[in-house]
Amino acid sequence: MRKQFFIFTLILLLLITYTCYKLVFAFNLSKLESLAVTLPLFFLMFGNFFVSRINPLMDEKKWYQYLTILGSLLMGLWGTFIIFSIITDFVKIIILIGINFLPSQSVVYIEISDWLFKFSNQYSFIIPIVAIIITVLGFLETIRGPVIKKIALKHKNINSDLHDFRIVQISDLHIGPSIQNEYINKVIQRTQQLDPDIIVLTGDIIDANPKIFAEQIQLLSHLKAKHGVYCIAGNHEYYWEINTVLNSLKKTNLTVLMNQNNIIKLNNTNLMIAGITDPTSKKMDPLNSPDLNKTLLNAQNLIIDFKILLAHQPNIYSEASQIGVDLLLSGHTHGGQFFPFNLLVPLVHKYYRGLAKHHEMAIYVNPGTGYWGPMNRFGIPAEISLLVLTQD
């Protein structure tokens, strides 16, 4: 724990230092002025993560909720500014290393050096402007709410009973200070218009104290489907006392699957809906650590024609494929949530957005129906996924 705290503190100090350095050049500030801007900025962006856990009652206060939303907007602006700054600084370093191999009096050396000087000083305002544009457009995208994406999903094990079976997937809603009644009702209304056979919520439904946001959680009771509404916990549910979160979900009409499954009978076909716990449970709820064999246990010894596994994080794909899962539904990655962070996600996750196939298993990773942290969805809109099973 001490090691993790040390690493976190070191990274935070490096980010503060780098931000101060970039603000000096971008806005022609003194070092002291830059520090005076950076410290309150970091508190607004990240302070709520600590304050809400130290004193959860703060989330009830409207002014604090507005402050959290402001921090979310600033986080998106800062994140975009920093990532573009890091990229441009990296390119400049590569160029500087390259021109050192040229004669210092050569025309090429002088022209490149002059361009680098102008870009670092006279044109340093470009990155903040780009960051502001991306932040504004990304914020407007979050206000619009999730889009509907329809996917025709083909698989060799889809028979005539399963043909045209409609699965609506909601993921990473992150109910909390910035996602409340209006946004949740928008999600519910758009979901119900899709005439779902089942609805699945693949984790990170709640990202705040469930006692304070009980009203918002209860709204999920309005989700209705012919064969039920199923959900699993993501990693964020564990940050708010998992048992309290699960109890609040069980007060709705959602069926919570914790290493469990349910079998739906469609004429002569048995469809299994299974849900596995998140890897976070290994440390925070070890009695309910992920157990794929237990999750897919067929206690009734029925012939299962099609197996659907709900797993918040998609990195379980290899084990799921080996054990015979037909369709893996996941979330967690947010697809990067907004440009340019979507370009970094493939470095961590093999399957991070949309439809894919691993051997014989189909995978769909929902990029998030809500958002986390920055109120920014530039280039990666929030999504409600409609998967229509289609016979080959």
Q: Could you describe each region identified by the protein language model?
A:
Residues M1-R144:
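Non-catalytic terminal accessory segments
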Residues K149-K150, N157-D392:
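Soluble catalytic domains of enzymes that build or remodel membrane lipids, polysaccharides, and related
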Residues N28, Q65-S72, L153, V168, ...:
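Short amphipathic alpha-helical coupling elements at transmembrane boundaries
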